[in-house]
């Protein structure tokens, strides 16, 4: 094969162990957020106008608004967004919200109403754009910037609207009888419950109020008793036949009955079946075929039946008997007396069909619609006297008014499916048919037909994403606004006003602000590393408004459900009280338009698996048999085995291959992103896998990221979708690169309206929400060719476009002197000195100068009573220099605050006389470094209020910023010039000129040489004879001028923003932010973890020479306890270790071959080895077609270790690991002889050694360690505060007191409870005594005792402490006297 393929070295090449081909593309991982919010905002208006969803739907549902008299109406026309005032970075820096102004076009229509006829005619129409507040915009990475911090709106899982049938599992009644209930849940509006009680009467409840008989509800819908019965029951007609009665025979009704008395044919009089026999379905059918039409019935058969219709004397209109009355002797006599020959009774046999509705009707005391409506009114509004109108209006507004009640499209679809109805999904209110169908279904359930619903099924739970949450919130704001508008329309002279005067947008804007600022679902983004960002955006929470609460959620809700397969990850969920309530979306899952989670499947047609992918929700999937992704297939895509393991309706079973109609897309569609990053997940216990998924999110980005040797193939996807690594927006050639930006001249997708230049600004040492460091580094060089989607810069925790959360370290599994007891970790000093686990954290310190009552605070270098030494890092404005090394207690920003006058001591008077005013009236309130923090100042930002004079430092920062903007503008201008003049030269080269610059002869042919004689700006003066070309030249010219103007306008706008003052909180004159970078090396007490839930704390850092070493002298980097593996059952870490060992072995081998090449220039052995490592298949890089440069580049990349990918559930197996170990020339046991670093003796046994990927977690000892001698005290109790943030003390609690009591250490105990805590006078005395060098003191009364006394006095109990000293007590009489 021709060696043509070049390799740019900008991506990590992995050897793939997966055997299953990837058919479906994994959807973008933050699609959930972006798609939802885009659908809500619909910033660009489509050509046919916006569809009724999202923001448009909200406006449509609230408008038009009419005033109370109907004389005027405010209509909604359309909305649009203005461009945002500040871009994302400016909002981050200035603590603003990234948002765009929303303009709504409203139309006010005023009517003339004819007083006599009441007819309306339009008098006046006014249209106007009204500003309706700012709408937060989503950044490209799916986050929001609110007051300068990045936030994420987490999607919420809630119960889908619709109808649900359930029973109480026998818990309500002591007999354990199942009481069935149905509940209609709308998207918004009143809930309707229909339930059985223990006596089998059907009741209805509205909004969980007092229960009413269900028939009351049906009567309120306009039905009467007879109609209700005929709806729920069939009738049987008894016809008088001499002394007896005859009833029609139907096989359906009699099958399965046991005959009590002989079954007699009414026509012939012969017995067709003797008593005591059971009538089987077959026998019943045979009787009908033989011609049995009717059978004889006695009066006894009639007793206990119920009348199906009223018995009325038509002459007088008197009702003798009502429908539903039970037939007994008296009733039957009445019937015969009235001369009835046919009696219709209800078909109730108390076995298949129960008399529940009939009994409910009998208990119901309401007889008419009016009574029923009044009854419902009394339940809903107790204490108000009902009138027919008010009751009717109230009942209508409960379920039938689209303003108050909304099932939503989802609710209607679910209801149609459950009840077999066919209403349009635009019918969003309940109908009479719906309520009847619900009651019918409930009665059928009670009769033993049908199934109850499982509310934890994902077909019954849906996801509310950002867009929908925001839509609901905005609707609330608009409804608040609506009330105000109505009042205003009625109160002012409507003829003279404009829409603007009616609208106060505050409530709408406040609703939005409240949602982003304080909703439970609006969360501070977890930005520790790129994975934690992605996971946070893909999180599904069952908590939040309208959801569950931790306390109420039982086991069932939290449990894994069969429908979670491929939709919600069964592994990733927090440990602790939220377990199972907060979940993560599976890798391939997406949310459909109804809010249900869908998973992709491959279609199986005629037993062959196709590559057609369909997305199905849980409801749709239940109808199919789905085979797993790892089923064996033959060449043609048919199933190899006769029977295939598949899932059907939540059960796993073996099905014949003909019955299988779908197949999973990929084995990793089962798990979430974090779990899909764990290699050998299939070999780990689920509990540990859960910890592994959760701890990867806490890994701190290290100074040098390194991708894992043993990956899963998910790493590049996470790095790209999280936005940590920068991918090229379009292809082109790299024009300029430095540490802060990459400039690319586009060659693909050139659009005349856009500039031909892409400038990518890299983030340098930005602080993340968790104080970790966000820093991006370019991967490209000037002149490189780039294609769309190529990774051009690495971000935090990424390495060549792969996610890299930790480092590969050489591990030995062995005990070492007890230093790895209880999961502790022993590290080599080499790890510290090589900065393997060193991370940079950026702390932000903020100081504000306010205007106080006594005068303004001042930021200055001139601070009273501070030595020159302490000011050495400050500039003349009193702000620390960039690059200064700062220590605890150092001043970062000097600030003085005026203090009130206090009486002066003679010394102060003297000072004032000598030094003048200044010294006395201010106090030092400078911003100092907190204890225990060392670092380097990396950035300073100064913010000034409008109109406040800027200091030197602010001016310098401003100049720098403007220079940077100018450089950007100039670069873009230069590339634009080069492009445009290049195109111009190409267009006129060799053409005949019709005109030209001064001194140019007309009719001459234009050549490049000729053009060089004139400056470029004069080339535009050339005109050509070809008119079409001349038109193109003019178009190019105008496009060039527009681009220049746009560039300049953009530049001026940015400069103006930099120069103008900043919005400040009230009372703040000036604010300074100082960013300090802290370098944290790993040290004892830091928490580390692998990817398999194997976590531990660093216990000791050992000199390299003491660490165990291999025969070749290589020392282990880290020693882990082998006992951490068996009981935890996370064997994945051992397999990873072996495979990592093989990777490093192969890398070493390649390194040796590289050295051979350098000596002999023979590349063949190297090429062969690499081709052997990366066999030719779809998943691996085409190494066979690499040219020599590419081979060398690849060899240099892998000489530290070959990177491999072992996808979850489809990864390397033991044979693969053994083969790789053998290739690398290592023992297949994966064990080596180790020598003790201290003695040089070999250890008794061989030790498992290899490379494992370790992470340093965010629980760093530097953030936790804390000490205090004196510090702040609580105001009331006067005890020291608690916690590091408050610089508090260590609590000597109840149990510690018991310990001292047990020792009898009385004086120590007294000290603890008094002078070391809250004896105010005592502690000052002790301090003075220590200063004097004296060690005697006396304890006084603790302040908490006084608090107790005051508390008792406030309850009215006077308690006084009699402080009588022993000295004043009379001496006891002497015993001798």
Curated annotation (Swiss-Prot):
The keyword Heme does not apply. One of its GO terms (biological process) is DNA-templated transcription. The RNAP catalytic core consists of 2 alpha, 1 beta, 1 beta' and 1 omega subunit. When a sigma factor is associated with the core the holoenzyme is formed, which can initiate transcription. It catalyses: RNA(n) + a ribonucleoside 5'-triphosphate = RNA(n+1) + diphosphate. One of its GO terms (molecular function) is DNA binding. HAMAP family: RNApol_bact_RpoB. This is DNA-directed RNA polymerase subunit beta. CDD domains: RNA_pol_B_RPB2 (cd00653). The keyword Nucleotidyltransferase applies. GO terms for cellular component: DNA-directed RNA polymerase complex. NCBIfam families: PRK00405.1 (NF001616), rpoB (TIGR02013). It is an enzyme of class 2 (transferase). It holds the Pfam family RNA_pol_Rpb2_2. Its EC number is 2.7.7.6. SUPFAM superfamilies: beta and beta-prime subunits of DNA dependent RNA-polymerase. It comes from the Bacteria. DNA-dependent RNA polymerase catalyzes the transcription of DNA into RNA using the four ribonucleoside triphosphates as substrates. It comes from Brucella suis biovar 1 (strain 1330). Keywords: DNA-directed RNA polymerase, Nucleotidyltransferase, Transcription, Transferase. Belongs to the RNA polymerase beta chain family.
């Amino acid at each position: 094969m021709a060696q043509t393929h070049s390799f740019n070295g900008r991506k990590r090449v992995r050897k793939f162990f997966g055997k299953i081909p990837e058919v479906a593309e994994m959807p973008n991982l933050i699609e959930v957020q972006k798609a939802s919010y885009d659908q809500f905002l619909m910033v660009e208006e489509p050509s046919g106008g916006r569809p009724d969803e999202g923001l448009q739907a909200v406006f449509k549902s609230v408008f038009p608004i009419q005033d109370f008299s109907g004389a005027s109406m405010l209509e909604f026309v359309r909305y649009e967004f203005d461009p945002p005032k500040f871009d994302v970075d400016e909002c981050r820096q200035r603590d603003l919200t990234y948002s765009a102004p929303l303009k709504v076009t409203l139309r006010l229509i005023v009517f003339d109403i004819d007083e006599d006829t009441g007819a309306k005619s339009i008098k006046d129409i006014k249209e106007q754009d009204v500003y309706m507040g700012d709408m937060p915009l989503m950044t490209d990475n799916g986050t929001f910037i609110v007051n300068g911090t990045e936030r994420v709106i987490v999607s919420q899982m809630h119960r889908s609207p619709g109808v649900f049938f359930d029973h109480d599992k026998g818990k309500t009644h002591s007999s354990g009888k199942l009481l069935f209930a149905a509940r209609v849940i709308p998207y918004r509006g009143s809930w309707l419950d229909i339930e059985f009680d223990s006596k089998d009467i059907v009741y209805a409840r509205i909004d969980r109020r007092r229960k009413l008989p269900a028939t009351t509800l049906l009567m309120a819908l306009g039905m009467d008793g007879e109609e209700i019965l005929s709806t729920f029951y069939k009738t049987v007609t008894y016809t008088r036949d001499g002394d007896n009665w005859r009833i029609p025979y139907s096989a359906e009704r009699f099958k399965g009955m046991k005959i009590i008395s002989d079954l007699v044919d009414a026509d012939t009089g012969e017995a067709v079946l003797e008593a005591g026999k059971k009538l089987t379905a077959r026998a019943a059918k045979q009787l009908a075929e033989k011609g049995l039409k009717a059978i004889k019935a006695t009066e006894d058969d009639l007793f206990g039946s119920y009348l199906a219709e009223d018995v009325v004397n038509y002459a007088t209109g008197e009702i003798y008997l009502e429908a539903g009355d039970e037939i007994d002797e008296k009733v039957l006599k009445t019937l015969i007396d009235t001369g009835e020959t046919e009696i219709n009774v209800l078909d109730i046999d108390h076995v298949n069909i129960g008399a529940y509705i009939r009994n409910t009707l009998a208990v119901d005391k309401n007889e008419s619609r009016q009574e029923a409506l009044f009854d419902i009114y009394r339940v809903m509004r107790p204490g108000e006297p009902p009138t027919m109108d008010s009751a009717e209006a109230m009942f209508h507004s409960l379920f039938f008014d689209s303003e108050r009640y909304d099932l939503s499209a989802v609710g209607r679809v679910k209801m149609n499916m459950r009840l077999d109805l066919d209403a349009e999904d635009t019918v969003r209110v309940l109908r009479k048919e719906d309520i009847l169908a619900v009651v019918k279904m409930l009665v059928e359930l009670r009769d033993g037909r049908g199934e109850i619903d499982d509310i934890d099924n994902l077909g019954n739970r849906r996801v509310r994403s950002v867009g929908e949450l925001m839509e609901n919130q905005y609707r609330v704001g608009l409804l608040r606004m609506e009330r105000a508008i109505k009042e205003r329309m009625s109160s002012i002279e409507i003829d003279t006003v404009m829409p603007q005067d009616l609208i106060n947008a505050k409530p709408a804007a406040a609703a939005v602000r409240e949602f982003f600022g304080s909703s439970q679902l609006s969360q501070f983004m977890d930005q520790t590393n790129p994975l934690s960002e992605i996971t946070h955006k893909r999180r599904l929470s069952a908590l939040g408004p309208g959801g569950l609460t931790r306390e109420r959620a039982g086991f069932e809700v939290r449990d894994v459900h069969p429908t979670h397969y491929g939709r919600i990850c069964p592994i990733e969920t927090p440990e602790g009280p939220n377990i199972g309530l907060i979940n993560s979306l599976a890798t391939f899952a997406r949310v459909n338009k109804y809010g249900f989670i869908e998973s992709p499947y491959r279609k199986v047609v005629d037993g062959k698996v196709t590559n057609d992918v369909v997305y199905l929700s849980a409801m749709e999937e239940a109808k199919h048999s789905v085979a797993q992704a790892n089923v064996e297939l033959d060449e043609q895509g048919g199933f190899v085995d006769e029977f295939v393991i598949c899932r059907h309706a939540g059960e796993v079973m073996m099905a014949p291959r003909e019955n299988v109609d779908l197949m999973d897309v990929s084995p990793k569609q089962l798990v979430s992103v974090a779990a899909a990053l764990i290699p050998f997940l299939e070999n780990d216990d689920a509990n540990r896998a859960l910890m592994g998924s959760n701890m990867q999110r806490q890994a701190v980005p290290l100074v040098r990221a390194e991708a894992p040797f043993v990956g899963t193939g998910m790493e590049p996807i996470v790095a790209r979708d999280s936005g940590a690594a920068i991918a090229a927006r379009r292809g082109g050639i790299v024009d300029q690169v430095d540490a802060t930006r990459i400039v690319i001249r586009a060659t693909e997708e050139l659009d005349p309206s856009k500039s031909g230049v892409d400038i990518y600004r890299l983030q340098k040492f930005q602080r993340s929400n968790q104080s970790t460091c966000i820093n991006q580094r370019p991967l490209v060089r000037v002149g490189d060719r780039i294609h769309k989607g190529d990774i051009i810069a690495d971000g935090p925790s990424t390495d060549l476009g792969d996610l890299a959360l930790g480092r590969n370290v050489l591990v030995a599994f062995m005990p070492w002197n007890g230093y790895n007891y209880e999961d502790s970790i022993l590290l080599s000093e080499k790890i510290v000195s090589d900065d393997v686990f060193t991370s940079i954290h950026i702390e932000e310190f903020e100081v504000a100068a306010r205007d106080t009552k006594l005068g303004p605070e001042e930021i200055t270098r001139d601070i009273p009573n501070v030595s020159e030494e302490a000011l050495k890092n400050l500039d003349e404005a009193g702000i620390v220099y960039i690059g200064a090394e700062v220590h605890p207690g150092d001043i970062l920003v000097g600030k003085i605050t005026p203090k009130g006058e206090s009486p002066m001591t003679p010394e102060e008077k003297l000072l004032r006389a000598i030094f003048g005013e200044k010294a006395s009236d201010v106090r030092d309130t400078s911003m100092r470094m907190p204890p225990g923090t060392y670092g380097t100042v990396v950035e300073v930002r100064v913010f000034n209020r409008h109109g406040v004079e800027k200091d030197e430092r602010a001016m310098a920062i401003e100049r720098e910023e403007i220079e940077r903007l100018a450089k950007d503008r100039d670069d873009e201008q230069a590339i634009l010039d080069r492009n445009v003049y290049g195109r111009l030269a190409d267009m006129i080269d060799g053409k005949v000129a019709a005109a030209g610059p001064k001194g140019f002869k007309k009719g001459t042919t234009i050549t490049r040489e000729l053009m060089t004689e004139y400056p470029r700006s004069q080339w535009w003066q050339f005109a050509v004879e070809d008119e079409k070309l001349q038109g193109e030249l003019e178009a190019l010219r105008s496009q060039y001028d527009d681009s220049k103007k746009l560039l300049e306008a953009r530049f001026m706008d940015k400069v103006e923003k930099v120069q103008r003052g900043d919005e400040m909180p009230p009372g703040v004159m000036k604010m300074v932010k100082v960013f300090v970078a802290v370098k944290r090396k790993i040290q004892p007490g830091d928490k580390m973890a692998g990817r398999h839930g194997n976590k531990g704390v660093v216990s000791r850092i050992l000199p390299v020479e003491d660490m165990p070493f291999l025969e070749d002298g290589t020392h282990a980097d880290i020693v882990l306890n082998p006992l951490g593996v068996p009981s935890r059952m996370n064997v994945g870490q051992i397999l990873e270790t072996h495979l990592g060992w093989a990777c490093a072995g192969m890398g070493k081998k390649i390194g040796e071959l590289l050295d051979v090449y350098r000596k002999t220039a023979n590349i063949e052995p190297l090429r062969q080895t690499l081709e052997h490592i990366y066999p030719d298949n779809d998943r691996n890089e085409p190494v066979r077609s690499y040219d020599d440069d590419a081979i060398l580049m690849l060899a240099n990349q892998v000489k530290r270790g070959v990177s491999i990918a072992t996808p979850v559930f489809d990864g390397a197996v033991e044979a693969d690991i053994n083969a790789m170990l053998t290739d690398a020339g290592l023992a297949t046991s994966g064990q080596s002889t180790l020598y003790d670093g201290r003695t040089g003796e070999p250890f008794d046994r061989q030790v498992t050694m290899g490379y494992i990927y370790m992470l340093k977690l965010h629980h760093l000892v530097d953030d936790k360690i804390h000490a205090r001698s004196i510090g702040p005290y609580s105001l009331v109790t006067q005890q020291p505060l608690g916690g590091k943030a408050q610089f508090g003390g260590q609590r000597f609690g109840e149990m510690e007191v018991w310990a001292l009591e047990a020792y009898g250490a009385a004086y120590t105990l007294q000290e603890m409870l008094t002078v070391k805590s809250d004896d105010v006078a005592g502690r000052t005395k002790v301090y003075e005594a220590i200063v004097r060098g004296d060690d005697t003191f006396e304890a006084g009364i603790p302040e908490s005792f006084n608090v107790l006394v005051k508390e008792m006095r406030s309850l009215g109990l006077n308690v006084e402490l009699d402080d009588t000293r022993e000295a004043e007590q009379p001496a006891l009489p002497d015993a001798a006297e």
